């Protein structure tokens, strides 16, 4: 089987709230569980030699959610950013951390923490992990300097949560991406799910507008 190159995988981490609702839990419980899955996802990507992993965690449109949920998501992101466990994990795994987003409405405390983690992991080069937080693709394209310009084209976009849209994610980089709409809610995403998604990707015939030669 011919294998497509897999340099950049992007994910829209969707379904946390609905996952929690099915268990009669508050939405923030789903976000807590979903955050735990990210560490495992990083290992899956490393094992498959992915060089860029980009995760959509909070969009500009997400400010329209209930204030308590928005506040919790920002607090959760900050806690993960400043955690020594996070830094140790990134250094051990040789991961370069990047943030993709707009500074609007974000606290100085959070922005300073992001900048520090980026600085401490800047020399790592096995995997570039980009967290898109407070980001919008259209706003990015409309800005004077495209803030996502450091990212290469996406090979595979996976959206969990049984929703079939790209929700204003990195529009420029998604131009020729293969897209998989995964039914699994994000907190239930496992290594088996990842392997199924990657297998499906490698079965695709990527043409980039051309006609593939006959064998």
What are the language-model segments listed below?
Residues 1-215:
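Flexible, compositionally biased loop and terminal segments
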């Amino acid at each position: 089987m011919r294998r497509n190159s897999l340099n950049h995988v992007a994910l829209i981490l969707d379904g946390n709230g609905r996952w929690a609702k099915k268990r009669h839990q508050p939405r923030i419980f789903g976000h807590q569980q979903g955050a735990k899955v990210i560490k495992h996802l990083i290992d899956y990507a490393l094992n498959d030699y992915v060089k860029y992993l980009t995760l959509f965690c909070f969009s500009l449109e997400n400010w329209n959610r209930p204030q308590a949920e928005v506040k919790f998501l920002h607090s959760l992101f900050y806690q993960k950013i400043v955690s020594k466990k996070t830094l140790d994990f990134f250094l051990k795994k040789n991961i370069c951390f990047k943030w993709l987003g707009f500074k609007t409405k974000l606290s100085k405390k959070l922005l300073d923490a992001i900048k520090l983690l980026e600085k401490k992991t800047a020399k790592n080069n096995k995997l570039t992990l980009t967290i898109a937080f407070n980001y919008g693709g259209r706003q990015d394209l409309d800005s004077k300097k495209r803030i996502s310009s450091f990212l290469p084209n996406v090979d595979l976009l996976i959206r969990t949560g049984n929703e079939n849209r790209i929700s204003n994610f990195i529009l420029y980089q998604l131009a020729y991406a293969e897209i998989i709409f995964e039914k699994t809610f994000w907190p239930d995403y496992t290594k088996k799910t990842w392997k199924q998604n990657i297998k499906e990707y490698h079965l695709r015939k990527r043409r980039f507008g051309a006609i593939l030669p006959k064998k």
